[in-house]
Amino acid sequence: MLTFCFSIRKNAIHAKEEVFCCVEAVKHPSCARDQGFSTLLIAYMRFVLVGIVFRRRFASKMGLENVSAGNTSSRAGVVIVADDLTGACDAAVAFSCQGVETEVVLNWRCARNSSAEVVAIDTESREIPVQEAVTRLESVSRQLDLKAFVHIFKKVDSVFRGNTFDEIATTVREFPSDLAIMAPAYPALGRTSMDGIVRVHDIVGERTFAVWDRLHAAGLHPRHIPAGRTSEEVAGALRVSLQEGHRFVYCDAYSEEDLHAVVRGGEKLEVRILWIGSAGLAHALALNMSSDIGKHLSFRPGQVPRVAPSSGIVVFFVGSDHPVTQEQMISLRKQTNVIEHSFEAPLSIKTKFIGPLVVPVRWGYTTERDICSAMEGLNQEDVSCLFITGGNSATLVCRALGINSLQLQDEFEPGLPCGVAVDGPFAGRTVILKSGGFGETDVLCRIAKTYQPDSHRKIEDAH
């Protein structure tokens, strides 16, 4: 506390000296002709002085002040910036699966307070106006000392929802890097890229996204590296791009091997790289960390801390209307003794304990108070697992339950990051998140069976 007070006093002294110089200039004889103006200006400057001291005190308490270059050793090795919570977890879990301490924070302003080696930040910018999303990214760049991180990763939605391309343009412009590499493919989940076109194959069917054209529309004109190249070929193409003054490159990827080649090729250059992609690129990056990265991160493959399922119920917060999620819900209703909460007719506490509890979340309608009402009477020991689907829903639910950060562990299955609530009434309980389009049809049933075994109804019993 004494150190804090001394720091504030020191800042105030410096600010006072700056204002004093301005006041002396105003008192110069050439300004004496307008004493009223001088008096007013001096009063204004005194007001500014108070504001400077207050802002610095507030920034220090909230962890918003920039960190000097000499403090870089205290920062995390990797920072991930995503536009929603599930996206942040999708990318960050790639590192926790390798045994690296990884934390996802809901409030990016508090990110620098984390001691984790990998920190993921949710800017909550997917569903807001473009200019506001741009402003939030500019704030991240300004308030966090991004140069202190070994790698910067901008997570983009694998089907490019929200303000994806405006955020990419802002990131390339604002975030410190020598080279920006974009590789949005996620082959493990049926998302590939050829000739600047991303093809998505899932339960909905097959769709294509002309990424190249949309990048051009956002004012970006990247160099292109086709799929099927070796890491040496990728490195060579990147070097040529840099030599010719092009610091933004788009890489196709049709397979996992293509993504690995992109990462290995990028690391051969030994320059600061801004990575832009989906969780597929994050996994490739985590699996191909060089010795240089190893100096900053503690990789412990196979030593991921796990929390064993505890007694209690599984609560499914369903905030996605994606067809994949709807199919998963149909399967859950058929195979478990599921209890569905209605905000119009709340369930009794005793009823809730019969089976997994499903709480519908409608973005723009469901409030934090509604979430708290659905969980009324349930304590930490009553809950084994919290499952949340839908990015905006995840943020809403976590805030309602007092969860400000998640310590990630691994994936329940690809695309379903699994972690532990760090704080709030449900601290220590497992939290599983899922983007709407991810997961096999029976994944919710398997979550219920894992974390609430007695809830599972045999298929023959359902007839």
Question: What is each residue range found by the language model?
Answer:
Residues 81, 120-122, 154-155, 181-185, ...:
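Short beta-strand segments
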Residues 278-287, 294, 299-302, 309, ...:
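Short, flexible loop segments at boundaries between secondary-structure elements
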Residues 383, 392-443:
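Conserved, well-ordered active-site substructure
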Residues 12-15, 23, 32, 48:
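Short hydrophobic alpha-helical segments enriched in small aliphatic residues
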